[in-house]
Amino acid sequence: MQITAQHLAELLLGMARAQAAIIQGLENEMAGIRSGRIVPALQNTAHLRDHPNPTLTDLPSRVLLSTLGRAVPDAAGITRDIERLCADSKPA
């Protein structure tokens, strides 16, 4: 079985949507937890301040953060990020 960047992007997006649904459920039960606790923790995990461009490690957190926002990320953009990151990490 060959996993492509497109497959991986769709998988990341699906997992992020599932996690966003859990976060929304928590927000419905405990108002303010999303903006007060969860989003700051995700921003820290995604290294938004110290890495302007995502690394492979940061990408899942960044996809989840994007999913929590108003503009849902598209699989094509995530695919481009994965392809760029994998090309950058190939040994010389």
Which positions does each model-derived feature cover?
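Residue-level recognition of alpha-helical structural elements
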Residues: 4, 8, 31-34, 53-57, ...
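N-terminal cationic amphipathic segment used for targeting or macromolecule association
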Residues: 14-18, 39, 90
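Amphipathic alpha-helical interaction modules
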Residues: 19-55
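Low-complexity intrinsically disordered segments
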Residues: 41-92
